[in-house]
């Protein structure tokens, strides 16, 4: 089954969206929501002396705090300090992590690049005497821009103070929220790199519009639904619909419903009244029903169609979604539309609409993601054939987002001490890489030939279940291939689990599987037995029929009979025993290992999947496949979301919108991808904090597809379907 198949929500999916997002993510979502009203808003969590002491500034305190908690020479106070203020801060200490003390420490160490960077932060209530003193220190220092450029990896990529950075909207979000407030009908072409909050942007837009969020891949929609519910945004679902009657309201959006007389909760919802719905989650098939439904409660001018990844299924000439997409576009009457993607095709959109067209495209990224070829060499644009370099330059100038796949350290080496920068604020990762592209345009053949002899080789990464496992560092990895079963078999083979141990594991798994099948039948029998009875009343009174009681007792007996199965740590990648086995204990600090809890392993072991997948799960390896049972998929997704899995093996179905954080990606040699789909694939990596990310190509051809202009099947097919 293709994941773009339009289906209703399963019980597991309903349950999964009810789980709240982590606290840090919730804070980001709240900021985006508030940011719609003030796109320029910034905030910084770093404490100043005032915010740490929880007191309000005044001139006397400015002087007193600077004199008391810093070593800055101060003149005698001329403004008397109020007795109440003196008592409030008496005997209190200020830690070295407050803003002013960090600034002074950096000045003392001569780290003036970081001083300049930190002076630009939006820290609340900084001490003016400290700021003035620091600026005086800076004025006496002449920046060495050549050296700072050479040190860019340490200063920018490995900036130890990056955790202090301001929280603000991405540039593309600021522009989107500004354009969305413009009067009149509009088509917004919203293009931004993956992992920069595009799927979160509808949350901000919901402050002005009632949103119909459409995506062909259900797991993308589920991610947004979960975020909305965590913010108490009222949602409804139009998934797998054959009519408006199939639309379902979340309880929070229900107006008319029948209460459970015993519990006081909602027993039955009238799904026809959606007047409270703020965000409608829809698939492509159900959109027109969702549109008509929403228009019964809101004028169409107050509704916005947010179509995420509209080019899904447009990389092939024929697809079951094509006629549905064509009908959607022709019959849509919602005047405000956002087409959101990392890779909207370059084409003339004026032929598709009479609305005002706005194009939002921001490709800047502070991330660096290394590309590695099958020979374990780093890939840079100048490693492509010399004849291709002019095309490469033009392509990179038009698609700045691709520069995040250009290794910063390699670029700095390429510059050989050259720098166009004159002040610290100009020295950024995007600016350095753009300068690299400028130099690339003037590269001679002799220079190109010299660079080919300087290829940087990195450690082998392919045997990631054995001696190379430590290279899967800093977070979970994902391996994308069409034939995931082949990769799964490779994992088991290279893990070198002894045949005797595998035989015993298979025996135990087979035993548990037989119990699982029996329990599955009993659960079905239990459900059937309850169908014709007044279950609600009987369960409340703790009274069940003898037949039901017998089934329940048998279920309990089988559940306790399930064997606990564990794989020795020596075969679980990057555990202490595994690293010791391969003699790489010195890599323990960077190596990432799984941390799947015992209850999840137990649940997976009783799931109806291939025994090899169960062994892989014990190794910390999950499989994303449309063929996998929903229960298994939800269990694995939950562990991936929590950063508990070591590696995920995934088919191309999961290229779009897998909004989990991966540090490394393997791209299988059996993948055949258009440029747009390749960029979507690479976007699975680099969504988290600033750590060393990597993408390991198993075919050299991917670099050419990425860095040179390519014919776009998506553009041709979109033009056909939207006309």
Model-derived segments and their meaning:
Residues 1-723:
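N-terminal helicase ATP-binding lobe
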């Amino acid at each position: 089954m293709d994941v773009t198949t339009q289906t209703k929500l399963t019980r597991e999916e309903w349950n999964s969206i009810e789980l709240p997002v982590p606290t840090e993510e919730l804070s980001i979502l709240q900021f985006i929501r508030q940011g719609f009203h003030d796109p320029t808003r910034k905030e910084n969590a770093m404490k100043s002396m005032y915010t740490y002491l929880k007191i309000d500034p005044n001139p006397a305190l400015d002087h007193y705090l600077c004199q008391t908690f810093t070593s800055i020479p101060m003149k005698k106070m001329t403004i008397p300090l109020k007795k109440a203020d003196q008592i409030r801060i008496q005997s209190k200490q200020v830690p070295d992590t407050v803003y002013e003390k960090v600034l002074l420490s950096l000045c003392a160490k001569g780290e003036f690049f970081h001083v300049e960077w930190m002076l630009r932060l939006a820290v609340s209530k900084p001490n003016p005497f400290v700021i003035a003193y620091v600026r005086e220190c800076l004025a006496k220092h002449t920046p060495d821009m050549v050296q700072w450029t050479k040190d860019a990896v340490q200063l920018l990529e490995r900036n130890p103070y990056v955790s202090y950075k301001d929280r603000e909207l991405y540039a593309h979000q600021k522009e989107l929220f500004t354009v969305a407030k413009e009067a009149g009908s509009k088509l917004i072409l919203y293009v931004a790199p993956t992992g920069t909050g595009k799927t979160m942007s509808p949350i901000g837009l919901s402050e002005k519009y009632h949103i119909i969020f459409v995506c062909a891949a259900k797991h993308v929609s589920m991610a947004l639904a979960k975020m909305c519910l965590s913010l108490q945004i009222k949602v409804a679902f139009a998934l797998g619909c054959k009519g408006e009657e199939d639309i379902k309201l979340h309880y929070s959006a229900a107006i008319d419903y029948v209460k459970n007389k015993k519990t006081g909760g909602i027993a039955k919802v009238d799904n026809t009244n959606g007047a409270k719905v703020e965000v409608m989650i829809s698939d492509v098939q159900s959109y027109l029903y969702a549109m008509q439904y929403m228009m019964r409660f809101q004028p169409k001018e107050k509704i916005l169609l947010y179509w995420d990844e509209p080019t899904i299924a447009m990389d092939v000439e024929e697809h079951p979604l094509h006629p549905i997409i064509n009908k959607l576009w022709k019959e849509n009457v919602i005047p405000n539309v956002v087409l959101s993607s990392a890779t909207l095709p370059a084409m003339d959109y004026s032929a598709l609409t009479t609305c005002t067209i706005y194009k939002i495209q921001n490709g800047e990224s502070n991330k660096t993601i290394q590309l590695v070829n099958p020979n374990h060499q780093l890939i840079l644009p100048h490693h492509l054939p010399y004849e291709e370099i002019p095309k490469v330059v033009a392509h990179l100038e038009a698609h700045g987002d691709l520069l995040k796949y250009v290794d910063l350290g390699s670029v700095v080496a390429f510059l050989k001490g050259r720098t166009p920068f004159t002040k610290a604020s100009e020295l950024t990762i995007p600016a350095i890489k753009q300068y690299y592209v400028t130099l690339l345009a003037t590269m001679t053949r002799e220079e190109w030939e010299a660079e080919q002899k300087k290829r940087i080789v990195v450690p082998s990464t392919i045997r990631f279940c054995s001696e190379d496992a430590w290279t899967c560092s800093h977070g979970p990895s994902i391996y994308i291939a069409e034939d995931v079963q082949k990769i799964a078999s490779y994992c088991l083979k290279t893990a070198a689990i002894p045949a005797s141990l595998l035989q015993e594991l298979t025996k135990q798994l087979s035993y548990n599987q037989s119990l699982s099948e029996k329990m599955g039948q009993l659960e079905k029998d239990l459900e059937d037995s309850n169908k014709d009875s007044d279950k609600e009343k009987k369960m409340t009174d703790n009274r069940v029929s003898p037949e039901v009681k017998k089934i329940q007792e048998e279920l309990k007996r089988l559940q306790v009979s399930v064997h606990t199965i564990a794989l020795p740590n020596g075969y679980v990648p990057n555990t202490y025993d595994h690293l010791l086995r391969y003699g790489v204990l010195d890599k323990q600090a960077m190596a990432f290992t799984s941390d799947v809890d015992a209850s999840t392993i137990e649940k997976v072991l009783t799931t109806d999947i291939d025994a090899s997948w169960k062994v892989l799960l014990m190794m910390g390896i999950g499989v994303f496949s449309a063929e996998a049972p929903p229960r298994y998929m939800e269990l694995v997704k939950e562990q991936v979301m929590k950063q508990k899995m070591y590696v995920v093996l995934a088919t191309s179905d999961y290229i779009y919108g897998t909004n989990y954080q991966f540090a490394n990606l393997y791209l299988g040699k059996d993948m055949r991808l258009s440029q747009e789909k390749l960029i979507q694939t690479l976007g699975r990596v680099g969504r988290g904090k600033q750590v060393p990310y990597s993408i390991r190509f198993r075919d050299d051809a991917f670099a050419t597809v990425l860095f040179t202009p390519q014919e776009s099947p998506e553009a041709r097919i979109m033009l056909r379907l939207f006309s």
